[in-house]
């Protein structure tokens, strides 16, 4: 999985079950066993954990480290996924699923996104489909969405690969879960990219920050 810094601690705590003690100890600047990551901010760091699913099976989750440069992690996630497919799972595309979480402005504005999508179906780079989750808060830092792109939707970049795009109201939790289930089923059956555009809002105090 790859994502930017916003919401990262939430994902680490509630999806990856990284303990609050581990998270808050990083605020204290505690020393790491590996000095290569010393001094990096806590919402740049990666994490790996094994989670038990409702059916009793276990799944290994990995969140890749990511700098403040939005979308820079995208090709890294794809590369890790392809390497695991080739070297660990004997080319089985169903064994591992790359998930990328985007912001609406970064998805439309960062060139690396288009580059990664263009490689999605190439023999030397394909990973059996990526699940793109787009958190659309309708603003890119201080840029209104009207001034952020020429296309109607930020997910129009997915038209390059004729990928399906599911639009869902981010305030409707049940609908979001249902959409995610459909997206995963599509990916596992057709091994193609799929996009989920979750429309949310951002509060005024947060926007000013």
Regions found by a protein language model. Name each.
Residues 122, 157, 186:
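Hydrophobic/aromatic ligand-binding patch that stacks against planar heteroaromatic rings
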């Amino acid at each position: 999985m790859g994502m930017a810094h916003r919401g990262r601690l939430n994902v680490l705590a509630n999806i990856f079950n990284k303990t609050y003690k581990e998270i808050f100890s990083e605020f204290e600047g505690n020393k790491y066993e590996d000095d290569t990551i010393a001094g990096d901010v806590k919402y740049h760091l990666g994490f790996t954990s094994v989670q038990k699913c409702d059916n009793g099976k276990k799944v290994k989750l990995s969140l890749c480290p990511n700098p403040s440069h939005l979308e820079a992690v995208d090709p890294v996630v794809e590369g890790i996924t392809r390497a695991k497919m080739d070297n660990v799972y004997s080319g089985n595309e169903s064994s591992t699923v790359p998930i990328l979480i985007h912001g609406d402005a970064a998805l439309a504005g960062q060139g690396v996104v288009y580059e990664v999508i263009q490689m999605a179906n190439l023999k030397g780079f394909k990973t059996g489909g990526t699940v793109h989750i787009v958190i659309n808060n309708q603003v890119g830092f201080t840029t209104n969405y009207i001034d952020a792109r020429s296309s109607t939707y930020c997910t129009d970049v997915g038209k390059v690969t004729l990928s399906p795009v599911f639009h869902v109201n981010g305030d409707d939790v049940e609908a979001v879960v249902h959409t995610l289930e459909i997206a995963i089923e599509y990916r596992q059956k057709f091994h193609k990219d799929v996009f989920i555009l979750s429309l949310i809002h951002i509060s005024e105090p947060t926007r000013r920050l």
